[in-house]
């Protein structure tokens, strides 16, 4: 799930309101939901970036990408 700029703005708005005056029960639930969505989005983006890495040995020029990562890349159609 990707998070929109509007959702990030809403997270910040709720955080400011929480500091200033507190949140209702519904707002607390909305804040928890939006925070979880944001964290899930960050994790998914990070995983996607890591899964595309190819590690090359500086001295030999040989591909030394860990086998586990190579297997994930093969599964996703990024390797032969």
From Swiss-Prot:
Its main location: cytoplasm. SUPFAM superfamilies: YnzC-like. The keyword Cytoplasm applies. One of its GO terms (cellular component) is cytoplasm. Coiled coil: none annotated. Pfam families: DUF896 (PF05979). This is UPF0291 protein LACR_1198. It comes from Lactococcus lactis subsp. cremoris (strain SK11). It comes from the Bacteria. It is found in: Cytoplasm. InterPro entries: DUF896. The lineage of its organism: Bacteria, Bacillati, Bacillota, Bacilli, Lactobacillales. Belongs to the UPF0291 family. Keywords: Cytoplasm.
């Amino acid at each position: 799930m990707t998070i929109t700029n509007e959702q990030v703005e809403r997270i910040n708005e709720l955080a400011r309101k929480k500091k200033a005056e507190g949140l209702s029960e519904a707002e607390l639930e909305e804040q928890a939901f939006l925070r979880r969505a944001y964290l899930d989005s960050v994790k998914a983006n990070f995983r996607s970036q890591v899964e595309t890495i190819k590690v090359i040995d500086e001295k030999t020029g040989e591909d030394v990408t860990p086998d586990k990562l190579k297997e994930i890349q093969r599964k996703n159609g990024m390797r032969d």
